[in-house]
Amino acid sequence: CNRDLRSTDIKFFDVDNDGDRDLFVANGHLESDVEEYENTTFPQRNQLYLNVGEGRFEEYVPTDGALALKRVSRGAAFGDYDDDGDIDVLVANVTSAPTLMRNDGAEGHWVRIALEGTGSNRAGIGARVEVHSGGKVQVNEVRSGSSFLSQSDLRLHFGLAAAQAIDRVV
């Protein structure tokens, strides 16, 4: 990560449905007068790091689009806004309107799991789900209050890459 950037939210999610979680970082400095200092600005570019395997991530740096914009971001909500099978990101910003980063680049197969309890925990908050597919085991949990001024989709999304079937769900 860049020392000149001030991170306000970090989330792992599978941006490309390849079964590996990538990393989104919302940035924006906390002090509006920070521009008095060299190499530091109040609005900053958010970042996306793609999981390239073996514990390594590479930053995806676009030349245009929402990730190229400088904003004062504070939180982010993750979910499939347009219901097309990939995770979109809605970013809460301080000095501008929210930014919807619509994801249209994911190509792998996927499954979405919505849990529904019968008692007081209707949304299944805290439930842990394992998906076994294509020789991989993925684990995710239903979480509430995931980010500042933001709430991510409570449905769990698992990218399956090229796998044609799910072996088991626990």
Which ranges hold each PLM region?
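Short charge-dense sequence patches
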Residues: 1-4, 26, 30, 78
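Gly/Ser/Thr/Pro-enriched helix-cap/hinge segments flanking short amphipathic alpha-helices
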Residues: 3, 44-47, 51-170
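Residue-level recognition of alpha-helix boundary/capping or hinge positions
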Residues: 8, 34-38, 112
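Structural signature of eukaryotic scaffold interfaces centered on beta-propeller domains
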Residues: 12-17, 79-83
